[in-house]
């Protein structure tokens, strides 16, 4: 049975912009994730698996943190997941960029202002835009997958298991956590 696994990265703040979409103000936070053949949290994500599934991130939610119920991760699309983490943000314009995946977090400003977490995100983005010394914003992909046994070559990369992705659930925004993949690996906002 596939399990949900969360893969975390850092946000690159250089290209934050504002757009009006559907008559509403949005922050657009460019982000990169899932570099090919990366090992994160002990799992190897092969280029073949990423290439086969990354487009599934288009239109997914971008919750604040990975939603949980009683300490267990749940889909961001479940009622509990929506109630726990939705701040008016979702993922758009997903595409392959070199050996990694580019996507944008579109944050509906009015919706984000309705929750403490959404307001905290807006404040953090404003601080980053001002050049204040604040913690970076990280992101984290959640995928439903099976953990397969690695072969000898895959184990040599540091992998304890190999991801067989079934589907992508979401790409979360993290304000108080560090990503599993780093900017040095080409990941983040």
Where are these regions (language model features)?
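Signature of dsDNA virion morphogenesis modules
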Residues: 1-189
């Amino acid at each position: 049975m596939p399990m949900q696994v969360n893969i975390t990265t850092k946000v690159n703040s250089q290209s934050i912009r504002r757009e009006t979409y559907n008559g509403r103000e949005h922050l657009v936070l460019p982000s990169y994730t899932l570099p090919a053949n990366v090992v994160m949290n002990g799992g190897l994500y092969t280029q073949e698996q990423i290439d086969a599934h990354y487009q599934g991130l288009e239109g997914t939610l971008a919750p604040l943190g990975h939603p949980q119920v009683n300490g267990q991760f749940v889909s961001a699309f479940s009622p509990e997941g929506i109630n726990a983490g939705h701040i008016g943000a979702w993922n758009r314009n997903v595409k392959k960029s070199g050996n990694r995946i580019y996507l944008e977090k579109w944050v509906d400003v009015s919706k984000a202002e309705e929750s403490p977490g959404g307001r905290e995100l807006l404040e953090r983005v404003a601080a980053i835009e001002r050049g204040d010394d604040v913690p970076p914003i990280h992101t984290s992909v959640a995928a439903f997958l099976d953990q397969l046994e690695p072969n000898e070559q895959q184990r040599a990369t540091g992998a304890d298991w190999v991801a067989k992705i079934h589907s992508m659930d979401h790409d979360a925004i993290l304000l108080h956590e560090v990503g599993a993949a780093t900017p040095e690996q080409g990941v983040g906002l």
